[in-house]
């Protein structure tokens, strides 16, 4: 399965009538492996900040998490494994795997729990497969 098919079939799929607004799989180096058409253009420094927070959990909390120029307030995640952010009625979940970042962006009516499930389940699978 291609990385694009993974984004299309596993991240942008329907869950209880809702979809993510955007999703991507990005390498730790910031190279996009695959993304939805709606995924924002990310800046290298944004990926660097995210990777730093995985290595030093809590480092993004004072400044916020930036993705495609949009600022998210960092909320409780899983240190070193998952970063979650909130902005108004939506937010973002980022799951770190061995080689990549699985990113899902959502807006209401999707719930944070639905976003977490869509992002973390395939992320766990990729971890098991060594990706």
From Swiss-Prot:
> Could you tell me which SMART domains the record lists for this protein?
PROF
An example Gene Ontology molecular-function term: actin monomer binding
| Record keywords | Actin-binding, Allergen, Cytoplasm, Cytoskeleton
The record's Gene3D superfamilies line, in alphabetical order, gives:
Dynein light chain 2a, cytoplasmic
Q: Which domain of life is it from?
A: Eukaryota
InterPro entries, A to Z: PFN, PFN_euk, PFN_sf, Profilin_CS
**Pfam families for this protein:** Profilin
* SUPFAM superfamilies the record matches: Profilin (actin-binding protein) (SSF55770)
Entry function:
Binds to actin and affects the structure of the cytoskeleton. At high concentrations, profilin prevents the polymerization of actin, whereas it enhances it at low concentrations. By binding to PIP2, it inhibits the formation of IP3 and DG.
Q: Which family does it belong to?
A: Belongs to the profilin family.
- Quote the protein name from its UniProt record: Profilin-1
Instruction: Specify the species.
Output: Ambrosia artemisiifolia (Common ragweed)
- Record lineage: Eukaryota, Viridiplantae, Streptophyta, Embryophyta, Tracheophyta
């Amino acid at each position: 399965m291609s990385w694009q098919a993974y984004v299309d079939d596993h991240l942008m799929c329907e869950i209880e009538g809702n979809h993510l607004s955007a999703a991507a799989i990005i390498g730790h180096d910031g190279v996009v492996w695959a993304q939805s058409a709606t995924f924002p253009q990310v800046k290298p420094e944004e990926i660097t900040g995210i990777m730093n927070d995985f290595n030093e959990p809590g480092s993004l909390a004072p400044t916020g998490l930036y993705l495609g120029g949009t600022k998210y307030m960092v909320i409780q995640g899983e240190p070193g494994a998952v970063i979650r952010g909130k902005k108004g009625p939506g937010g973002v979940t980022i799951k770190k795997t061995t080689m990549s970042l699985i990113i899902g962006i959502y807006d209401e009516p999707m719930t944070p729990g639905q976003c977490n499930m869509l992002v973390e389940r395939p992320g766990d699978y990729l971890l098991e497969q060594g990706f």
